[in-house]
Amino acid sequence: MNLKRLLALLLGVVMLLSLASCGEESKVVETKDEAGWFTTWTSAQLTAGPDETPFDPALKENTCRQQIRVSIGGEKIRLTLSNEYGDIPVNIEGVRIAHLLDPNAPAIDASTDTAVTFGGANEVTIEAGTVVTSDEIDFKFEALDDLAVTMKFGKFTGGTITSHTAARASTWIAAGDHLADETFTPEKVMTSWYFLNSLETWGEAGTRTIVCIGDSITDGASSTTNAFARYSDELARRLQANDATKNISVAAKGIGGNAVFGGLGTACKDRFDRDVINVPGVKYCVVMIGINDIGYEGEDMSDTRS
């Protein structure tokens, strides 16, 4: 094992220990074994860069259909949208969820198409720096199903877009209102998620969520678009293949280029509460981080050493 790999391993161990005992006193997070909301899908939020920001058409006044693959099934959902990194309010005129027929095309099963409401309204405005969670919605789906979340955006202009830049899944954008269309011809196909934070489902007592937090390794670097080949995806498949673990959902919180003390997006030490501790239903956590803290040549590592 060369020195760089050894340092990465040691740093990962230190990171795990430090996160487990951050602050002046150790924190013990108690989780209750009872029915409640559990995260069946999620992504780690960050700012969309120029290459990940849609143009011609942009999101303003247009339709965006995004796909997700859930880890456990359910019959009730809550959808959380994020404008955490935005600097202006984002207006969304409508949100719908449906079963996706094929990960490579925007066609949905129209018989499953369901409106997602916020405080009883179809329209929602997400203030800058905030997240919103939908009403409880009746919607039935099975573990490992592919779902489509379709949004029709309003007249917000400019501003920073909150996204997960490396979705490794197709997102389809078309001009105008295609919110309830069974399918449409996209004018732009991106591979980022926009304003889409998490999907929760109601689970019975004994349900658990495991969070996978890390950098590009966790985020599926170099994996095939629409193949859902992150290690967290494979973990979800294996958990569902065993009757004893079908009650465990998987929440992926990797960010390519992320680091313990910096890197791309919010540093792992600063997002741990948001992306692990506060994830609905969390019981377990896999931490794989540290290589980017020592991998960038010529950078000052004084903070890392400290």
Task: Indicate residue ranges for each PLM-predicted region.
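N-terminal secretory targeting modules
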Residues: 24-213, 223-225, 244
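Low-complexity, intrinsically disordered short peptide segments enriched in small/polar/basic residues
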Residues: 10-11, 26, 283
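Bacterial N-terminal signal peptides that target proteins for export
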Residues: 1-10
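C-terminal motif of bacterial Sec signal peptides marking the signal peptidase cleavage site
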Residues: 17-21
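Conserved SGNH/GDSL esterase-like catalytic core that processes O-acyl groups on lipids
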Residues: 63-66, 89, 97-104, 175-192, ...
